Amino acid sequence: MMMQKLRRSGEFIRFGCKSLISSRPNKDSVSRSVSGFVNHYKSKGKLFELSDGNYKTELHHPCISRNVGMLLQQYKCFGSSAASLIQRNPLFSSLDSKDVSYFKEILGEKNVVEDKERLETANTDWMHKYKGSSKLMLLPKNTQEVSQILEYCDSRRLAVVPQGGNTGLVGGSVPVFDEVIVNVGLMNKILSFDEVSGVLVCEAGCILENLATFLDTKGFIMPLDLGAKGSCHIGGNVSTNAGGLRLIRYGSLHGTVLGLEAVTANGNVLDMLGTLRKDNTGYDLKHLFIGSEGSLGIVTKVSILTQPKLSSVNLAFIACKDYLSCQKLLVEAKRNLGEILSAFEFLDNNSMDLVLNHLDGVRNPVSSSENFYILIETTGSDETNDREKLEAFLLKSLEKGLVSDGVIAQDINQASSFWRIREGITEALQKAGAVYKYDLSLPVEEIYNIVNDLRGRLGDLANVMGYGHLGDGNLHLNISAAEYNDKLLGLIEPYVYEWTSKHRGSISAEHGLGVMKANEIFYSKSPETVALMASIKKLLDPKGILNPYKVLPHSLFSN
């Protein structure tokens, strides 16, 4: 009765606190969620730690102030743990033979996968870090079949995990327990392409590289380019709001996705597949599904604005002595290259050494070894003018001491070898051993400070490296070690999240939260904001069957 009253009152922060402190078996999850709560309000000057270890609060919101004492007691009690414990939601049903028979009726035998070998692959994430125990993978061929699957699963309270190319890095695309896998790989048709507007409409299972190949024949390019383009699906890209190499030029998917079709938990099909660049009729609901990681609905079709393929593409590989030079170079590139600047990527010397040591056929394009390397890509319509512009920029940067060495690719093969270095870092990390990956968004001037701080903190325990999309403030922080161990993880987390929050950053720039960072959301979002997100989740997925244990703190849904 008390819980119903709290839900009706809309005082979700109070409800959230109640959930947090009632889930004692998940004490590490509780600690993380409460830790984020504490850090958020300490940073806003509303919460003060006293010399005796207690806290004084100046929170006046009635939903928070009544429960802050209990919250803080839990925080002090549990401390900060490196591991997250998740319990299977007991309200979810378990799969039985009748369920399997139903799915075979609507999908056909071959599209209901029970084979252990195929399930082993589908249950395991790309980094082999997260592994579920699903006994069933479904392969729908169209939106109607997705609708039938979800309507049935919702009625039976069978949890579902949407899956595409399974290239995610935060455990978002694999089961946590025995969730039914719904893989959209067979939904891979290109439905239409308008060469006047450049609008492409396709199904969610289309592989990004295949879309790029198709568009190339039409004289267009995708606004999105990723290292995983050979495997990732456009539906997964949209569901995680993937960023990639071209964001500095073409912006995020919130800007380039014009419309989408999605199926909600109860099987309802939401047709928002517009192709218009302007539509001011009410709430633009597609944005709820972009970046929601399949927790609000399964994206089945996408309408995306593509760009004309320009004739002039140039790529420079540059060496810089320090991070300050990299920052200044970015400012100069924006001023001097302007509209033709299409990528500005960076990697440190540790990343370069890793690639050289673990990938065959890769070499450093510049003669001198430096602390940092930059890839600058320009895209325009005048080959001669664009190249002269890039050469003049590099010469000027060399004279200013911002660049110590550099080379411009002379042909497509050399350009590919440059990109191989940047895109091969993740592959090299896998070959090197255990890796702890963090995808952070920070003010550009702060990006490398966390790398240096973490090196000092970890010492010889691990190899810390930083690379990423400097043009949009996205750092890929990677810690490479011989093996995974709790001591190392305890030194990394929650330190990385606390550092990022302190410097007004985001703990997820483009990879999403998944299961890895669901409990860490408070480091980047206020409790009020998370409460509203949870309300939206409950509205669209009342039984919580869609990608459970992901995106939002597990404790909010434990009841």
UniProtKB/Swiss-Prot annotation:
<dbReference type="InterPro" id="IPR016167">
    <property type="entry name" value="FAD-bd_PCMH_sub1"/>
</dbReference>
<dbReference type="GO" id="GO:0005739">
    <property type="term" value="C:mitochondrion"/>
</dbReference>
<feature type="transit peptide" description="Mitochondrion">
    <location>
        <begin position="1"/>
        <end position="78"/>
    </location>
</feature>
<dbReference type="InterPro" id="IPR016166">
    <property type="entry name" value="FAD-bd_PCMH"/>
</dbReference>
<protein>
    <recommendedName>
        <fullName>D-2-hydroxyglutarate dehydrogenase, mitochondrial</fullName>
        <ecNumber>1.1.99.39</ecNumber>
    </recommendedName>
</protein>
<comment type="similarity">
    <text>Belongs to the FAD-binding oxidoreductase/transferase type 4 family.</text>
</comment>
<dbReference type="InterPro" id="IPR016171">
    <property type="entry name" value="Vanillyl_alc_oxidase_C-sub2"/>
</dbReference>
<comment type="subunit">
    <text>Homodimer.</text>
</comment>
<dbReference type="InterPro" id="IPR006094">
    <property type="entry name" value="Oxid_FAD_bind_N"/>
</dbReference>
<dbReference type="GO" id="GO:0071949">
    <property type="term" value="F:FAD binding"/>
</dbReference>
<dbReference type="InterPro" id="IPR051264">
    <property type="entry name" value="FAD-oxidored/transferase_4"/>
</dbReference>
<dbReference type="InterPro" id="IPR004113">
    <property type="entry name" value="FAD-bd_oxidored_4_C"/>
</dbReference>
<dbReference type="GO" id="GO:0010230">
    <property type="term" value="P:alternative respiration"/>
</dbReference>
<dbReference type="Pfam" id="PF02913">
    <property type="entry name" value="FAD-oxidase_C"/>
</dbReference>
<dbReference type="GO" id="GO:0005886">
    <property type="term" value="C:plasma membrane"/>
</dbReference>
<dbReference type="InterPro" id="IPR016164">
    <property type="entry name" value="FAD-linked_Oxase-like_C"/>
</dbReference>
<dbReference type="InterPro" id="IPR036318">
    <property type="entry name" value="FAD-bd_PCMH-like_sf"/>
</dbReference>
<dbReference type="Pfam" id="PF01565">
    <property type="entry name" value="FAD_binding_4"/>
</dbReference>
<comment type="function">
    <text>Catalyzes the oxidation of (R)-2-hydroxyglutarate to 2-oxoglutarate. May be involved in the catabolism of propionyl-CoA derived from beta-oxidation. Involved in degradation of lysine for the supply of carbon and electrons to the ETF/ETFQO complex during dark-induced sugar starvation.</text>
</comment>
<dbReference type="InterPro" id="IPR016169">
    <property type="entry name" value="FAD-bd_PCMH_sub2"/>
</dbReference>
<keyword id="KW-0274">FAD</keyword>
<keyword id="KW-0496">Mitochondrion</keyword>
<keyword id="KW-0809">Transit peptide</keyword>
<keyword id="KW-0285">Flavoprotein</keyword>
<dbReference type="GO" id="GO:0051990">
    <property type="term" value="F:(R)-2-hydroxyglutarate dehydrogenase activity"/>
</dbReference>
<dbReference type="GO" id="GO:0009853">
    <property type="term" value="P:photorespiration"/>
</dbReference>
<keyword id="KW-0560">Oxidoreductase</keyword>
<feature type="domain" description="FAD-binding PCMH-type">
    <location>
        <begin position="130"/>
        <end position="309"/>
    </location>
</feature>
<dbReference type="GO" id="GO:0047545">
    <property type="term" value="F:2-hydroxyglutarate dehydrogenase activity"/>
</dbReference>
